[in-house]
């Protein structure tokens, strides 16, 4: 897949970050050999970090990679939550991407392996998919370092969403590591506007997948081993609020008219 106006595919990695000065440098270091590999194969790799009003040195950590990795920083003046940061990530990436490009999102806490992106793109092309989920629940996927409670919440949310608001091809509805075709994502952004991401917290990842997948986007998965043991610092998830928001999201999605995006 190439953009007609450009012979090169660009991978745009959009990272929502909040107080990740301890984890972000390690993740960006892992991106450097990936960028070299992609460029040697005739592709390009760019990173956009959306800083969601961090109170630590997250911005400085990202800017330290401007020369080595071409990182751009898009700041929020105040903390607005993961949903707003994801919305800005998608908007910023689409402003920079050609229709033939691909846009990836992942957590900025170094629990996801950016080295999977070429394989995810290969799966996307082989299956003519619009979205590839890096999935803990695909054959070969796993979770390392998660508490039993977090595992129950993640698996329970995906089970409930599969039961109540299924998306063909999806097992892992909540993981933030995904690869999207830019052209499809642009159609979705045009159709939904700012309403593409309405959830403020962690449920925003499921929301986007439901709106795209139930709007006709073709979804597949690639196995992910989530390395939560590499995370520096405590989780920012508010457990009870997240659970209540999943039930509210299901009600809203089941009642909504889904515009076609693919």
Predicted features and spans:
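Short beta-strand/loop segment that forms part of the nucleotide-sugar
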Residues: 39-53, 74-75
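Hydrophobic helical membrane-anchoring modules
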Residues: 1-11, 191-262
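Short, acidic, metal-binding catalytic loop of nucleotide-sugar glycosyltransferases
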Residues: 29-43
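Acceptor/aglycone-binding surface of glycosyltransferases and processive sugar-polymer synthases
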Residues: 76-95, 102, 114-198, 230-237, ...
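Hydrophobic targeting segments
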Residues: 9-15, 24, 31, 44-50, ...
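A conserved acidic beta->alpha catalytic loop
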Residues: 51-60, 78, 110
């Amino acid at each position: 897949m190439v953009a007609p106006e450009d012979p090169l595919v660009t991978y745009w990695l959009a990272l929502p970050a909040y107080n990740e000065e301890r984890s972000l440098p390690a993740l960006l270091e892992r991106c450097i050999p990936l960028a070299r590999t992609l460029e040697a194969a005739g592709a390009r790799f760019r990173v956009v970090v959306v800083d969601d009003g961090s109170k630590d040195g997250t911005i400085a950590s990202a800017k330290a990679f401007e020369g080595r990795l071409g990182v751009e920083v898009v700041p929020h003046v105040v903390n607005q939550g993961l949903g707003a940061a994801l919305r800005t990530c998608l908007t910023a990436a689409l402003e920079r991407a050609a229709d033939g490009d691909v846009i990836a999102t992942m957590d900025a806490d170094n629990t996801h392996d950016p080295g999977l992106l070429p394989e995810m793109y290969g799966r996307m092309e082989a299956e003519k998919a619009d979205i590839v989920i890096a999935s803990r629940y695909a054959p070969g996927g796993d979770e390392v370092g998660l508490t039993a409670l977090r595992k129950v919440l993640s698996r329970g949310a995906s089970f409930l969403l599969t039961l109540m608001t299924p998306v063909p091809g999806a097992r892992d509805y909540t993981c933030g590591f995904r690869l999207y075709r830019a052209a499809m994502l642009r159609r979705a952004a045009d159709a939904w506007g700012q309403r593409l991401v309405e959830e403020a917290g962690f449920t925003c990842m499921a929301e986007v997948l439901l709106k795209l997948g139930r709007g006709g986007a073709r979804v597949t998965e690639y196995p992910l081993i989530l390395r939560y043991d590499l995370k520096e610092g405590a989780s920012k998830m508010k457990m009870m609020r997240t659970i209540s928001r999943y039930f509210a999201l299901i009600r809203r999605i089941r009642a909504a008219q889904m515009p076609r995006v693919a």
